[in-house]
UniProtKB/Swiss-Prot annotation:
<dbReference type="GO" id="GO:0009277">
    <property type="term" value="C:fungal-type cell wall"/>
</dbReference>
<dbReference type="Pfam" id="PF05730">
    <property type="entry name" value="CFEM"/>
</dbReference>
<keyword id="KW-0732">Signal</keyword>
<dbReference type="GO" id="GO:0005199">
    <property type="term" value="F:structural constituent of cell wall"/>
</dbReference>
<feature type="disulfide bond">
    <location>
        <begin position="51"/>
        <end position="82"/>
    </location>
</feature>
<keyword id="KW-0964">Secreted</keyword>
<keyword id="KW-0479">Metal-binding</keyword>
<keyword id="KW-0349">Heme</keyword>
<dbReference type="GO" id="GO:0009986">
    <property type="term" value="C:cell surface"/>
</dbReference>
<dbReference type="InterPro" id="IPR008427">
    <property type="entry name" value="Extracellular_membr_CFEM_dom"/>
</dbReference>
<dbReference type="GO" id="GO:0005576">
    <property type="term" value="C:extracellular region"/>
</dbReference>
<feature type="region of interest" description="Disordered">
    <location>
        <begin position="86"/>
        <end position="208"/>
    </location>
</feature>
<keyword id="KW-0336">GPI-anchor</keyword>
<dbReference type="GO" id="GO:0098552">
    <property type="term" value="C:side of membrane"/>
</dbReference>
<feature type="domain" description="CFEM">
    <location>
        <begin position="23"/>
        <end position="109"/>
    </location>
</feature>
<feature type="propeptide" description="Removed in mature form">
    <location>
        <begin position="216"/>
        <end position="234"/>
    </location>
</feature>
<comment type="similarity">
    <text>Belongs to the CCW14 family.</text>
</comment>
Amino acid sequence: MASFLKISTLIAIVSTLQTTLAAPPACLLACVAKVEKGSKCSGLNDLSCICTTKNSDVEKCLKEICPNGDADTAISAFKSSCSGYSSQSSSSESESESASSEESSASASASASSSAGKSSNVEASTTKESSSAKASSSAAGSSEAVSSATETASTEESSSAAASASASASATKESSSEAASSTSSTLKESKTSTTAAASSSESTTATGVLTQSEGSAAKVGLGALVGLVGAVLL
């Protein structure tokens, strides 16, 4: 169906060109058919579509494939065939431009409204952020104060602990000194007792030796006396 419409449209274009120009160049027909085939123009408005949207493509094709003498003739024939559609194209373009300007105005209004809304949102967000920042700074100040108080208390506790440790060390040194002194005194007394005991033992031993010597001498004297008496009696 689409191919039939294109063929019928091409026939209509050829007949239009023939009424405009008695004998249109063959290259003109070839270029119109080529451009119409590669474009989106279809239906009964093919010639209008080609004249308004593809006229530059047709002229370029004519300059490329038409002989030198036929190119200008073909371009003139194409322009004369599209003369009625060019005025329609101008009115369509003006309508499109007015519609575009209206759309631009509407877009500008919408953009302005959107910008105003965004500005309000930004201001509200900025206010909230300021409040949040103040609350955060207050909380940070409170936290710093608590931290400072905690550090002070920790420092005081550390000082007290250090003082207690120093006192304990002093007490330990004094106890060690007293224990050393007591041990030294005990050792001295023990040495003195040992010396006295040794002296007493030596004295006792000497006395025993002297007593034993004296007993032996008495026994010897008594024996001599008994012998002397026995000799006298004999």
